[in-house]
């Protein structure tokens, strides 16, 4: 573990992590605890964090505490739980994959603004990290060349499609999810520009995240949960609807959040979590290579390739500053996933 020089948040500082029971959030918590920080994690009920609380009590005694926020849209929802925090990682969002705009986009925006308002009213907060997604920049378009995505890229198309596509369209829920991430992040930057609070905002934009599932009871519906289902021979029709795209290790996503919270040179940045491209046949080929004695489903029909390119210079700077030479490979990420589920 690399020592963090001139950290914005001194070691031992308290960080509030919203939606801490989620797959990505649990990896953010893990990296914060591993690097000497204290974490207050929220969930809609204490039971949703019970297994993770036991894990972290055993591994990092006295450094993680559970806080219940039943409704992130309620006025003042975070006002009490944020007290004493030096940093905030707002990860809680709507992941129902409903195709109804008002059920997904509206609460995503409202929850984000609620957390920002609470931070603005809390003098101890120095950094705020919003978990966005690469879909706030673009939904992957297979076999299309010349797409380059940087910190100025926004998926404005998703907002229109989320509002206008018929509910019978099988891709509608994906566009609604993308709109929720796009609009919530845009609302966050607008809040910062208009209110000029005392803290710094950074955003982390992960793509398909693969890694250890810390709590199978609550995280089976995550991206890694879907991949594990394929490992176990279940071919969900939903997988065929997911285009080729980028993957990223959950470890690296945890580190990117950590860097956005504590590294002084990372300010007002949109940081992509895009290690490399994959499709389901890449995953199946990796399964067969790593676990040759196991039988896996047949390959999917050719889905093409994601030919887009992302500006990952800020991401790689963070990883290097935290002692990592670069991205974890898809093989390492899949080993992390399968090992956690078969141990």
From Swiss-Prot:
Reaction catalysed by this enzyme: a primary alcohol + NADP(+) = an aldehyde + NADPH + H(+)
Consequence the record notes for mutating residue 22 to A: Results in loss of substrate inhibition and of NADPH-dependent reductase activity
Activity regulation behaviour: Inhibited by quercetin and diphenylhydantoin.
Activity profile over pH: Optimum pH is 5.5.
Record's keyword annotation contains Zinc-finger: no
Disulfide bonds: none
Alphabetical keyword list: NADP, Oxidoreductase
InterPro entries: Epimerase_deHydtase, NAD(P)-bd_dom_sf, NAD(P)_dehydrat-like
Effect of residue 25 to G: Only active when NADPH is replaced by NADH
Residues involved in NADP(+) binding: 177
Its EC number(s): 1.1.1.2
GO molecular function per UniProt: alcohol dehydrogenase (NADP+) activity
Temperature dependence: Optimum temperature is 40 degrees Celsius.
Pfam families: Epimerase (PF01370)
Record's function text: Catalyzes the asymmetric reduction of o-substituted aliphatic and aromatic aldehydes and ketones to an S-enantiomer. Reduces ethyl 4-chloro-3-oxobutanoate to ethyl (S)-4-chloro-3-hydroxybutanoate.
PANTHER family: ALDEHYDE REDUCTASE II (AFU_ORTHOLOGUE AFUA_1G11360), NAD DEPENDENT EPIMERASE/DEHYDRATASE
Assembly and binders: Monomer.
Family under the similarity heading: Belongs to the NAD(P)-dependent epimerase/dehydratase family. Dihydroflavonol-4-reductase subfamily.
Name this protein carries in UniProt: Aldehyde reductase 2
Organism: Sporidiobolus salmonicolor (Yeast-like fungus)
Organism lineage: Eukaryota, Fungi, Dikarya, Basidiomycota, Pucciniomycotina
């Amino acid at each position: 573990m690399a020592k963090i020089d001139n950290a914005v948040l001194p070691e031992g500082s308290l960080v509030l992590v919203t939606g801490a029971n989620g797959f990505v959030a649990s990896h953010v918590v893990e990296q914060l605890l591993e690097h000497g920080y204290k974490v207050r994690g929220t969930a809609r009920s204490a039971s949703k964090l019970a297994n993770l609380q036991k894990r972290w009590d055993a591994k990092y005694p006295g450094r993680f505490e559970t806080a219940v926020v039943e409704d992130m849209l309620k006025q003042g929802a975070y006002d009490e739980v944020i007290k004493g925090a030096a940093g905030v990682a707002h990860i809680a969002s709507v992941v129902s994959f409903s195709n109804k705009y008002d059920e997904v986009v509206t609460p995503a925006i409202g929850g984000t603004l609620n957390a920002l308002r609470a931070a603005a009213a809390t003098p101890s907060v120095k950094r705020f990290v919003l978990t966005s997604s690469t879909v706030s920049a673009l939904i992957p378009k297979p076999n299309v060349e010349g797409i380059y995505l940087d910190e100025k890229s926004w998926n404005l198309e998703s907002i229109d499609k989320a509002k206008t596509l018929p509910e019978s369209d099988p891709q509608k829920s994906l566009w609604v999810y993308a709109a929720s991430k796009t609009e919530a992040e845009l609302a966050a930057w607008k809040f910062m520009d208009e209110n000029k609070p005392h803290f710094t905002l950074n955003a982390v934009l992960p793509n398909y995240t693969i890694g250890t599932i810390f709590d199978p009871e609550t995280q089976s519906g995550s991206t890694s949960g879907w991949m594990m289902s394929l490992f176990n021979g279940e071919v969900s029709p939903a997988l065929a609807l997911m285009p080729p795209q980028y993957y990223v290790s959950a470890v690296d996503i945890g580190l990117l959040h950590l860097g956005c919270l504590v590294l002084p040179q990372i300010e007002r940045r949109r940081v992509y979590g895009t290690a490399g491209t994959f499709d389901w046949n890449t995953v199946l080929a990796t399964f067969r290579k790593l676990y040759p004695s196991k039988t896996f489903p047949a390959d999917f029909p050719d889905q093409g390739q994601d030919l887009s390119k992302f500006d990952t210079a800020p991401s790689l700077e963070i990883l290097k500053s935290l002692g990592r030479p670069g991205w974890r490979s898809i093989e390492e990420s899949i080993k992390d996933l399968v090992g956690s589920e078969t141990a």
